Amino acid sequence: RGGRNQELVLAALAEAWDSGLDRLVILSGGTDGEDGPTDAAGAEVDQDLWRTARTRKLSPEPFLAINDSYTFFETIGGLLQTGPTHTNVMDLRVALILA
């Protein structure tokens, strides 16, 4: 369960997971408020959510393996839930690596 934006954020997190690159912010969402067959527009992860996942011993890999990014982000509080916006411009993606 999850959509392209949630999956993208989870895949990026998985790439950074073992590298220790935890000072980052990644956000991806659909401007129409929808991402796949879910009630979320996308997902985001930052340092706080990274720590939440680590504390709860949630690794992104098992969720990626079954394409269930929604449950991962629902568990750590990283879903972007805007509701339908009726404005479909494009997907918005932001990635910041903090110094």
Language model regions located:
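Internal helix-turn-beta structural module
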Residues: 2, 9-99
